[in-house]
Amino acid sequence: MSDDKKSDDYRVDMPSSRTSRAPSPIMRPALKSAPSLTENPMAAVLAYCASSILMTVTNKYVLSGVDFNLNFFLLCVQSVVCVTAISICKAAGLITYRDFNTDEAKKWFPISLLLIGMIYTGTWALKYLSIPVYTIFKNLTIILIAYGEVLWFGGSVTPMTLFSFGLMVLSSIIAAWADIQHALNSFGQQSEAANEALSTMHAGYLWMAFNCVCSATYLLSMRKRIKLTNFKDYDTMYYNNLLTIPILLVASILVEDWSSANIQKNFPPEQRNTVIMVMVISGMSTVFISYTSAWAVRVTSSTTYSMVGALNKLPIAISGLVFFDAPVTFGSVSAIFVGFVSGIVYAVAKVRQNSKPKTVLPTTNIPLSASSRSMQDSLKA
């Protein structure tokens, strides 16, 4: 473009008495198109919270059956549903992930074993404990992961993070105390029903301790292995679920009772279709959690995502009070509140820690993939 042409662009011609100019067209501002639903941060956050609640409630519904004991079979059904769902999505061109590779499967197989340990112990803990207590105690996994990062990845724990850990421990103590007091007040101090309720709770706490250790080990190991395999979101989901199917199926056949009498107990005729449908929905919810987690990470900031992870504990705990008639006492509500505050304090502490300028190599805050985040959040439920 020449200089004369540029000057013409900024020149204003004065109208001549001998000539007339046509009126200039009225310039209207361009209308902005409304943002699509997939770019809406609020929709992503609500979908993420809803999928977390859906998975917790459906699992609790199946596991809270009086005689349900086919936990390996439940996990196998969930894995089959998940692999089927993402395979259909890949065939439809909605998502992409790597094709099965034997060498990659061998590298990832130990992670799948740890995943089985984490989910299996979690099912027994969720069976014996109420959803609010389970959610509160799940916070203790964060403490183990934090100190695991200190040992394995050279991480650090700030004073504010340490304060949030103290609140997490306090909320767990309050929840256990409230649970025990409710059992004693409901059934009497020395009654057989009270002793049975206490033994059930103690079994739940023991399974919860195993679950916290397994969860921390799984997540730390997966973080290390993802760096070696360079897996993306759906790669991790695909291999995690595909490799666990044969293990869970064999474990169910060898360990669990498949007699006709036990099948009748696990799937009573009047509830059989409902239980099977809920098992399938719980498998689909794992896909929903992974997708909505990745969606929330994409359309929100890391700060918002961290805060959503903390705030998500409250509706999950409340869902246990609403859907499963968990005891609503001063102690249980206080435990939920303290656990909720501890999550917020922890999220703020991590945001502040990550916002500090890094003067050394970034070995302390290597981000997890969205799939590992979604798996960790779904099991905090």
UniProtKB/Swiss-Prot annotation:
Offer one example of a GO biological process linked to this entry. GDP-mannose transmembrane transport
Q: Write out the topological domains of type Cytoplasmic.
A: 1-36, 89-107, 154-161, 221-242, 296-303, 349-381
Name the residue ranges with Basic and acidic residues bias: 1-12
Location of the protein in the cell: Golgi apparatus membrane; Cytoplasmic vesicle membrane; Endoplasmic reticulum membrane
Which residues does the entry place in the Lumenal compartment?
58-67, 127-130, 185-199, 264-274, 325-327
Which key words are in the record? Cytoplasmic vesicle, Endoplasmic reticulum, Golgi apparatus, Membrane, Sugar transport, Transmembrane, Transmembrane helix, Transport
| GO cellular-component term (any) | Golgi apparatus
InterPro entries hit by this protein: TPT_transporter
Region annotated Disordered, chain positions: 1-28
Q: What is its main location?
A: Golgi
Membrane-spanning parts: 37-57, 68-88, 108-126, 131-153, 162-184, 200-220, 243-263, 275-295, 304-324, 328-348
Q: Does the keyword Transport apply?
A: yes
According to Swiss-Prot or TrEMBL, what is its membrane topology?
Multi-pass membrane protein
Q: Which GO terms describe its molecular function?
A: antiporter activity; GDP-mannose transmembrane transporter activity
Q: Has UniProt tagged this entry with the keyword Transmembrane helix?
A: yes
Q: Which family does it belong to?
A: Belongs to the TPT transporter family. SLC35D subfamily.
Record's subunit section: Homooligomer.
Per the entry, what this protein does is: Involved in the import of GDP-mannose from the cytoplasm into the Golgi lumen.
Instruction: Please give the name of this protein.
Output: GDP-mannose transporter
